[in-house]
């Protein structure tokens, strides 16, 4: 059982890299939306802009769950990622913070453009320290070629990545998918990242 868990987390690490790399580097389309219906291998997803998209998965797909967490779960030494907006003082106001399991350390490490909102950024790195700030806790996150201070406000969504399973993805589930468009207009992906217990991928 322990070995199976380790293998699952290792696969999660490998397959989740697309979550945190620039789209141009992956030649992928990031789909954010809600599962409307499931017809055999076909997932019908309504994107945030109301567009209906059809998605299939590759063989042996990976299901990655997003579980609700809190700032209390973030400790120095953990590897985290955050989508947010840069502020005039050089800090990054976090829209969300996702906590990686140790097996995923290094995934998408760095600071780069993200497509959640205009001018949004993604920062993935190691938590050096957490201090109190005027607007909320401030995480010092160090990556291979720099460091950013992430301001975590009461509105910031904090979640953790955990191994998931197919049965949890049902109509109404909020999902994030990094997919490739197929010649027939459908999309295909090796994994689905989805919200568990009401959580939704905020990135």
Cite the ranges covered by each PLM segment.
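Bacterial N-terminal signal peptides that target proteins for export
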Residues: 1-10
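Short, flexible, surface-exposed loop segments at domain boundaries
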Residues: 2, 18-203
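Bacterial N-terminal signal peptides
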Residues: 9-20
């Amino acid at each position: 059982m322990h070995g199976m868990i380790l293998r699952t987390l290792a696969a999660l690490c490998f397959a989740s890299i697309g979550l945190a790399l620039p789209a141009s580097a992956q030649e992928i389309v990031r789909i954010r939306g809600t599962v409307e219906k499931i017809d055999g291998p076909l997932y019908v997803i309504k994107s945030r802009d109301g567009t209906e998209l059809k998605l299939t998965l590759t063989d042996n797909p990976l299901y990655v769950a997003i579980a609700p967490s809190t700032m209390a779960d973030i400790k120095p030494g953990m590897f985290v990622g955050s989508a947010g907006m840069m502020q005039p003082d050089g800090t990054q106001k976090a829209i969300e913070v996702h906590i990686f399991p140790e097996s995923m350390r290094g995934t998408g490490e760095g600071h780069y453009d993200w497509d959640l909102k205009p001018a949004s950024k993604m920062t993935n790195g190691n938590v050096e320290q957490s201090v109190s700030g005027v607007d909320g806790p401030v995480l010092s996150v160090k990556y291979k070629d720099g460091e950013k201070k992430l301001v975590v406000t009461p509105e910031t969504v904090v979640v953790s990545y955990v191994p998931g399973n197919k049965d949890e993805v049902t109509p109404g589930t909020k999902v994030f998918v990094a997919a490739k468009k197929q010649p027939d207009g459908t999309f295909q992906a090796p994994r689905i990242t989805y919200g568990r217990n009401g959580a939704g991928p905020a990135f």
